[in-house]
């Protein structure tokens, strides 16, 4: 494993790259395969750690997983599902991944029980799982806290319940979808996340036989069905990776063609990219991003849930804004601790200060909670 990367800078980034499937979709699509005993096939799969983690967890539960890394194709056959006997090994495999909590719904449907190891997180916020647990318990699951994690039991078939999310959490929306599709009755999920990756997961579930409708007011209705089949699907491109390449081209005065990038899922990013001073050309096979010359412009920006400016685009954009003329303000409203990387940028010569106050936008849920969530 590489422990250090040495980068020789000072050269504009030029050339062509290809993005693979979205990291915020693929692991969840793999979990969805557990909802059917039939084989599911997923294409455009990226080489990321979460794919390895979910593959190992699927195998631990009795599924067969074949991954052609060169072709980017995963074939998953659940077959006879069972609970792993070694919870310690399961915890070790999962590491800091949040994915295991999403196994709960499919396992409760097939086995009537699920075990979730102690969940880690990341360095950008607490990411609590209380929304997930509330959904599972409302649908009829009983939770037993054990030393190594949580044991969830469904003594009767899960039954649909209305679900309202106090915040449009992506993870809680995924949990509701994966649990509701085979629960008895109709689930109405309000204040749901509607990110492109959520829409692609819904497309997968619909291919499997689910009945799901999405309204314009963040309401998703899921009619439970008795049985689902396997799916064949090509994952949508990773808009985070595409935005990162775009910002790298902008920060270095370069010119990069990102094959596979899609305009539809990057509308808010493209608007910001152009406002800062970048230029782009949407083509059939991808998007070309380049620095057209002249000075980059500073700006005030606020991250938000979709269709707002994605929080994952904030890091690479801040790097590009260090090259802009004037003072930029970035207000992070999705995760409470997402400016730790600015310390490294300051060591490299940037001038960035973080604040607890809501700057450059409307007050957000972190405004009175003592989190450094604004940067200047």
Where are these regions (language model features)?
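Short, structured segments at the rim of ligand-binding sites
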Residues: 1-376
């Amino acid at each position: 494993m590489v422990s250090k990367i040495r980068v020789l800078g000072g050269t504009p980034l030029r050339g062509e790259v290809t993005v693979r499937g979205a990291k915020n979709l693929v692991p969840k699509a793999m979990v969805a395969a557990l909802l059917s005993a039939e084989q599911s096939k997923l294409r455009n799969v990226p080489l990321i750690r979460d794919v390895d983690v979910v593959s190992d967890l699927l195998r631990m539960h009795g599924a067969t997983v074949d991954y052609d890394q060169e072709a980017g194709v995963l074939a998953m056959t659940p077959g006879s599902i069972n609970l792993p006997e070694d919870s310690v090994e399961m915890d070790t495999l999962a590491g800091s991944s949040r994915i295991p909590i999403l196994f709960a719904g499919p396992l409760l449907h097939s086995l009537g029980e699920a075990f979730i190891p102690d969940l880690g997180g990341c360095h950008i916020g607490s990411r609590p799982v209380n929304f997930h647990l509330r959904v599972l318990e409302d649908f009829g699951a009983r939770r037993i806290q054990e030393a190594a994690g949580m044991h969830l039991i469904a003594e009767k078939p899960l039954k649909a319940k209305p679900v309202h999310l106090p915040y449009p959490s992506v993870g809680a929306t995924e949990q509701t979808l994966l649990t509701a599709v085979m629960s008895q009755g109709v689930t109405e999920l309000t204040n749901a996340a509607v990110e492109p990756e959520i829409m692609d997961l819904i497309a997968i579930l619909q291919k499997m036989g689910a009945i799901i409708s999405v309204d314009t007011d963040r309401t998703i209705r899921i009619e439970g069905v008795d049985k689902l089949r396997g799916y064949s699907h090509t994952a949508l491109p990773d808009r985070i990776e595409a935005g990162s390449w775009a910002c790298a081209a902008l920060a270095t005065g370069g010119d990069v063609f990102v094959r596979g990038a899609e305009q539809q899922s990057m509308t808010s990013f493209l608007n910001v990219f152009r406002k800062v001073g970048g230029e782009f050309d949407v083509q059939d096979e991808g998007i070309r991003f380049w620095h057209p010359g002249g000075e980059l412009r500073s700006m005030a920006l606020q991250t938000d849930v979709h269709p707002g400016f994605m929080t994952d685009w904030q890091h690479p954009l801040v790097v590009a804004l260090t090259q802009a003329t004037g003072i930029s303000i970035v207000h992070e409203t999705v995760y409470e601790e997402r400016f730790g990387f600015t310390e490294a940028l300051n060591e490299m010569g940037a001038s960035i200060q973080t604040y607890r106050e809501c700057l450059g936008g409307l007050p957000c849920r972190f405004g009175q909670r003592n989190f450094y969530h604004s940067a200047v």
